[in-house]
């Protein structure tokens, strides 16, 4: 499909939610302009002209006449919330990201819902509050149980994988480097647990995600590691 309107993508590499949108943009091969928002000195123009409702990233503007990113056209559509944007892109570029079979689409959306509740809560608990690793591992095992024997979450790469990929990549990054509020060494122990045969299917799933060109184009391992190493929200006391 020929893209009919401009897309400006407001983002920051720290955010797994922004990463979702970035992967989706690459998957559908959209023509877009990425604008990094300084999250340490949040620009006022963003709060008033791009996302006055939640004042969060990611966001996109779509359509309207050409305009500077800091002063988007009033005619441009402004969209926020990562999965809203991902679904919009799937609509804008039909045949990509969204399964055509209604059952598989329902399964994909269920996968997203489970990830955004169960895995996300365990992610926050372990890395930001230092709760036991067992909950995170249990939730990852639950996600693994929903995977087919081969391929992605519902077979072909879809919105389900777009939702999961940024968090799975960061989970592995943080565990391997023992970053988080949990006791020293607990991250590496959990990382080693994930290398055991019990989690072989999940590890293959993550490897397949990381091998996609959309992931490689949207993820800078060294930069993301540096950002999270210096994130005060997950520093140990």
Labelled PLM ranges:
Residues 201, 205-214, 224, 229, ...:
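Acidic, serine/threonine- and proline-rich low-complexity regulatory tracts
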Residues 1-144, 148-149:
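GST-like domain detector, emphasizing the conserved glutathione-binding G-site
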Residues 1-7, 217, 230-237:
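Eukaryotic N-terminal low-complexity, Ser/Thr- and Lys/Arg-rich leader segments
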Residues 103, 110-211:
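GST-like fold's C-terminal all-alpha helical module
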Residues 90, 167-168, 219:
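Active-site-flanking alpha-helical
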Residues 58-61, 163, 219:
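Residues embedded in well-ordered beta-strands within globular domains across many folds
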Residues 102, 217-226:
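Short, flexible loop/turn segments with low-complexity composition
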């Amino acid at each position: 499909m020929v893209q009919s309107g401009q897309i400006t993508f407001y983002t920051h590499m720290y955010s797994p939610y922004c990463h979702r949108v970035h992967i989706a943009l690459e998957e559908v091969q959209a023509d877009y302009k990425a604008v990094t928002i300084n999250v340490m000195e949040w620009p006022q123009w963003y709060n008033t002209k791009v996302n006055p409702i939640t004042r969060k990233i990611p966001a996109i503007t779509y359509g309207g006449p050409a305009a500077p990113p800091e002063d988007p056209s009033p005619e441009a559509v402004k969209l926020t919330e990562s999965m809203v944007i991902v679904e919009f892109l799937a609509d804008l570029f039909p045949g990509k990201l969204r399964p055509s079979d209604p059952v598989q689409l329902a399964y994909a959306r269920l996968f997203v819902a489970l990830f955004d509740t169960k895995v996300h809560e365990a992610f926050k608990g372990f890395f930001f509050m230092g709760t036991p690793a067992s909950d995170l591992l249990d939730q990852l095992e639950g996600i693994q149980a929903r995977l087919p024997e081969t391929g992605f979450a519902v077979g072909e790469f879809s919105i389900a994988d777009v939702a999961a990929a940024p968090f799975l990549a960061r989970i592995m990054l943080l565990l391997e480097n023992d970053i988080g509020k949990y006791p020293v060494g607990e991250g590496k122990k959990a990382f080693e647990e994930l290398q055991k045969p019990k989690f072989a299917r999940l590890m293959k799933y993550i490897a397949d995600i990381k091998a996609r060109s959309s992931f490689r184009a949207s993820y800078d391992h060294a930069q993301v590691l540096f950002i999270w190493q210096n994130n005060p929200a997950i520093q140990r006391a």
